[in-house]
Curated annotation (Swiss-Prot):
Source organism, top-level taxon: Bacteria
Organism the protein comes from: Trichodesmium erythraeum (strain IMS101)
Alphabetical list of Pfam families matching this protein: tRNA_m1G_MT
Catalytic activity: guanosine(37) in tRNA + S-adenosyl-L-methionine = N(1)-methylguanosine(37) in tRNA + S-adenosyl-L-homocysteine + H(+)
Alphabetically ordered keywords of this record: Cytoplasm, Methyltransferase, S-adenosyl-L-methionine, Transferase, tRNA processing
Subcellular location: Cytoplasm
Matches recorded under CDD domains: TrmD-like (cd18080)
Protein's name according to its UniProt entry: tRNA (guanine-N(1)-)-methyltransferase
Length: 227
């Protein structure tokens, strides 16, 4: 999987992409990230990437020329998707990550900034994606979230496939409670069923906990087909 990230702040990605599970995945060449600064594709001496909005308004708008030039400079793999990170896009969910990890080999992520991005960038974009119903200073954090969510689903990133299958949202439910040693901490005890060694009973208990937790915390998931 190849990620090409169009961003004015490439340094923002350095530490997260070299740490933990993501860092190991990139070191093993399971995925590759290419950071592209559109400022390098400007044609004026000031390297200007933004300008005032036609019709007036507060804030600056990212110009289309550097974005187009940056994207068009990239190699084109056969299964490619160009994604704009914007609060106006569809919200990320586990089903989206599965689709991107399975169906594509190149994801180009365009990080918006300032007041917005020139609407004509739509002619480049396959889809718009949002981290949630809130506004951030730019698309870098959503891009990191998307990269993280997709890379961990690629074969070889997570040691055991069943680790992924049992997680929140993979079954459409939240995850069950997890416990480790000690069995008794300040009077709070691990449920007896988890100490029993009875695998069928443990599986039944975990599923019941998933249902209860989902009904209590995220009842919308029980009605939502997206996940």
């Amino acid at each position: 999987m190849r990620f090409d990230v169009i961003t004015l702040f490439p340094d923002f990605f350095t530490t997260p992409l070299n740490s933990g599970l993501l860092g190991r995945a990139f070191n093993k060449n399971i995925a590759k990230v290419n950071l592209v600064n559109p400022r390098n594709y400007t044609t004026d001496k000031y390297k200007k990437v933004d300008d005032e909005s036609y019709g007036g308004g507060v804030g600056m708008v990212l110009k289309p020329e550097p974005i187009f030039a940056a994207v068009e400079s990239l190699p084109t793999l056969s299964k490619r998707e160009v994604i704009l990170l914007t609060p106006q896009g569809k919200r990320m969910h586990q089903g989206l990550f599965r689709e991107l990890a399975t169906d594509y080999e190149q994801l180009i992520l365009i990080c918006g900034h300032y007041e917005g991005i020139d609407e004509r960038v739509q002619y480049l974009v396959s889809r718009e994606v949002s981290l949630g119903d809130f506004v951030l200073t730019g698309g870098e954090i959503p891009a990191l979230a998307l990269i993280n969510g997709v890379v961990r689903l690629l074969p070889g990133t997570v040691g055991k496939a069943e680790s992924l299958e049992c997680e929140s949202f993979e079954s459409g439910l939240l995850d069950y409670p997890q416990y480790t040693r000690p069995a008794n901490f300040r009077g709070w005890k691990v449920p007896e069923v988890l100490l029993s060694g009875h695998h069928a009973e443990i599986a039944r208990w975990r599923y019941q906990q998933q249902l209860q937790r989902t009904k209590s915390r995220r009842p919308d998931l029980l009605k939502n087909d997206d996940n």
